[in-house]
């Protein structure tokens, strides 16, 4: 006789990989800004000058769209926090760069994978609503 004990429902997690292949310096600088922006919003901040407590990191509302409209074929995702980020500067297996400038040599391709966790536990009721 086997018995299973129900303990909890884990928060759903989602990973989204984004590969960037900038064609020029302007696009390369935009990739750098995107990566810094996600890093910034992933982390908490101190709530006071004594640095004894944190404020929660930014929340994200992820929605799938197709041609400007919500894509109802893909389940909805409730509000999330970003729980991880991996940046791969050797997307093709080898590290390749543009010509160096005064800052160094920027990578030709970059893959940023962002991991998100929902802040709401899913139930049968939320799944029935399209989540």
Kindly give the residue locations of the regions a language model identified.
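Acidic, Ser/Thr- and Gly-enriched intrinsically disordered low-complexity segments
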Residues: 1-131
